Regions:
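Glycine-rich flexible loops
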Residues: 1-143
Length: 143
Protein backbone atom coordinates (compact mmCIF):
# COMPACT_ATOMS: atom_id res chain seq x y z
CA UNK A 1 0.00 0.00 0.00
CA UNK A 2 2.82 2.42 0.85
CA UNK A 3 4.59 1.71 -2.43
CA UNK A 4 1.35 2.03 -4.42
CA UNK A 5 0.78 5.46 -2.91
CA UNK A 6 4.34 6.49 -3.72
CA UNK A 7 4.07 5.29 -7.32
CA UNK A 8 0.84 7.23 -7.77
CA UNK A 9 2.50 10.43 -6.56
CA UNK A 10 0.47 10.69 -3.37
CA UNK A 11 3.45 11.49 -1.13
CA UNK A 12 5.83 14.39 -1.29
CA UNK A 13 9.05 13.51 0.50
CA UNK A 14 8.01 12.25 3.95
CA UNK A 15 4.36 13.38 3.76
CA UNK A 16 1.65 11.02 4.98
CA UNK A 17 1.62 7.94 7.18
CA UNK A 18 0.10 4.51 7.50
CA UNK A 19 -0.96 2.22 10.33
CA UNK A 20 -2.29 -1.33 10.22
CA UNK A 21 -3.89 -3.28 13.09
CA UNK A 22 -2.15 -6.64 12.76
CA UNK A 23 -4.19 -9.83 13.02
CA UNK A 24 -3.21 -12.19 15.88
CA UNK A 25 -2.30 -14.99 13.45
CA UNK A 26 0.00 -12.59 11.56
CA UNK A 27 1.71 -11.61 14.81
CA UNK A 28 2.36 -15.29 15.57
CA UNK A 29 4.02 -15.75 12.17
CA UNK A 30 6.66 -13.08 12.86
CA UNK A 31 6.92 -12.99 16.67
CA UNK A 32 10.27 -14.80 16.65
CA UNK A 33 11.78 -11.66 15.07
CA UNK A 34 10.61 -9.34 17.85
CA UNK A 35 12.98 -7.53 20.17
CA UNK A 36 11.02 -5.47 22.67
CA UNK A 37 12.27 -1.99 23.52
CA UNK A 38 11.23 0.46 26.22
CA UNK A 39 7.62 1.48 26.80
CA UNK A 40 6.58 4.97 25.68
CA UNK A 41 3.36 6.87 26.40
CA UNK A 42 0.91 7.03 23.49
CA UNK A 43 -0.48 10.36 24.70
CA UNK A 44 -4.01 9.00 24.85
CA UNK A 45 -5.77 5.86 26.06
CA UNK A 46 -7.15 3.25 23.67
CA UNK A 47 -8.28 0.48 26.04
CA UNK A 48 -10.13 -1.47 23.34
CA UNK A 49 -6.81 -1.95 21.54
CA UNK A 50 -4.86 -3.04 24.63
CA UNK A 51 -2.34 -5.79 23.94
CA UNK A 52 -2.66 -5.49 20.16
CA UNK A 53 0.09 -5.00 17.58
CA UNK A 54 0.33 -2.40 14.81
CA UNK A 55 2.55 -1.91 11.80
CA UNK A 56 3.19 1.82 11.37
CA UNK A 57 5.36 4.11 9.30
CA UNK A 58 8.12 5.97 11.07
CA UNK A 59 8.06 9.69 11.74
CA UNK A 60 9.85 11.57 8.97
CA UNK A 61 10.32 8.42 6.89
CA UNK A 62 9.64 8.27 3.16
CA UNK A 63 6.95 5.98 1.73
CA UNK A 64 9.37 5.40 -1.16
CA UNK A 65 11.73 3.57 1.19
CA UNK A 66 9.19 1.21 2.77
CA UNK A 67 9.84 -1.48 0.15
CA UNK A 68 13.56 -0.65 -0.18
CA UNK A 69 14.43 -0.60 3.54
CA UNK A 70 11.38 -1.70 5.52
CA UNK A 71 13.40 -2.30 8.69
CA UNK A 72 14.39 1.39 8.70
CA UNK A 73 11.12 2.90 7.45
CA UNK A 74 8.41 1.13 9.45
CA UNK A 75 7.99 -0.57 12.79
CA UNK A 76 5.78 -3.03 14.59
CA UNK A 77 4.55 -1.77 17.94
CA UNK A 78 2.80 -3.49 20.82
CA UNK A 79 0.34 -1.74 23.14
CA UNK A 80 0.37 -2.45 26.87
CA UNK A 81 -2.48 -4.07 28.81
CA UNK A 82 -4.19 -0.71 29.41
CA UNK A 83 -3.76 0.72 25.91
CA UNK A 84 -1.81 3.69 27.27
CA UNK A 85 1.75 2.87 26.23
CA UNK A 86 3.50 1.33 23.23
CA UNK A 87 6.84 -0.25 22.57
CA UNK A 88 8.61 -0.98 19.32
CA UNK A 89 9.16 -4.71 18.87
CA UNK A 90 10.56 -4.60 15.32
CA UNK A 91 11.86 -2.03 12.85
CA UNK A 92 13.23 1.51 12.86
CA UNK A 93 16.65 -0.10 13.22
CA UNK A 94 18.53 3.17 12.71
CA UNK A 95 16.54 4.96 15.37
CA UNK A 96 13.38 6.96 15.15
CA UNK A 97 9.87 6.75 16.43
CA UNK A 98 6.47 5.85 15.03
CA UNK A 99 4.51 8.43 13.07
CA UNK A 100 3.69 11.60 14.98
CA UNK A 101 0.07 10.84 14.10
CA UNK A 102 0.12 7.63 16.17
CA UNK A 103 -2.40 8.82 18.81
CA UNK A 104 -4.96 9.88 16.20
CA UNK A 105 -4.41 6.71 14.16
CA UNK A 106 -4.98 4.54 17.23
CA UNK A 107 -8.08 6.48 18.27
CA UNK A 108 -9.52 6.03 14.78
CA UNK A 109 -8.62 2.34 14.72
CA UNK A 110 -10.28 1.86 18.11
CA UNK A 111 -13.53 3.42 16.86
CA UNK A 112 -13.45 1.38 13.66
CA UNK A 113 -12.75 -1.85 15.57
CA UNK A 114 -15.86 -1.28 17.68
CA UNK A 115 -17.91 -0.70 14.52
CA UNK A 116 -16.53 -3.55 12.43
CA UNK A 117 -13.49 -5.79 13.06
CA UNK A 118 -12.61 -5.73 9.36
CA UNK A 119 -11.38 -2.12 9.45
CA UNK A 120 -7.66 -2.32 10.10
CA UNK A 121 -5.93 0.49 8.19
CA UNK A 122 -5.52 4.23 8.59
CA UNK A 123 -3.85 5.78 5.54
CA UNK A 124 -2.99 9.47 5.45
CA UNK A 125 -1.72 10.93 2.17
CA UNK A 126 -1.06 14.37 0.74
CA UNK A 127 -2.45 13.74 -2.72
CA UNK A 128 -1.34 16.65 -4.89
CA UNK A 129 -4.27 16.51 -7.30
CA UNK A 130 -6.84 16.47 -4.49
CA UNK A 131 -5.07 19.37 -2.78
CA UNK A 132 -5.13 21.28 -6.09
CA UNK A 133 -8.88 20.71 -6.33
CA UNK A 134 -9.36 22.64 -3.08
CA UNK A 135 -8.25 25.73 -5.01
CA UNK A 136 -10.59 25.05 -7.94
CA UNK A 137 -13.80 23.66 -6.44
CA UNK A 138 -16.00 25.54 -3.98
CA UNK A 139 -15.31 24.57 -0.38
CA UNK A 140 -18.68 23.00 0.32
CA UNK A 141 -19.59 19.69 1.95
CA UNK A 142 -21.90 18.73 -0.92
CA UNK A 143 -19.02 18.74 -3.45
Amino acid sequence: MANDGWEQGWHERNGGNLSYRVKPEEVEEVKENFEAREWNPIGTAVPNLAGEYFLVTGSGKYFRNVTIKPEDSICMIELDEKGENYRIVWGLVNGGRPTSELPSHLMNLEVKKLQDERYRVVYHAHTTNVIALTFVLPLEDKV
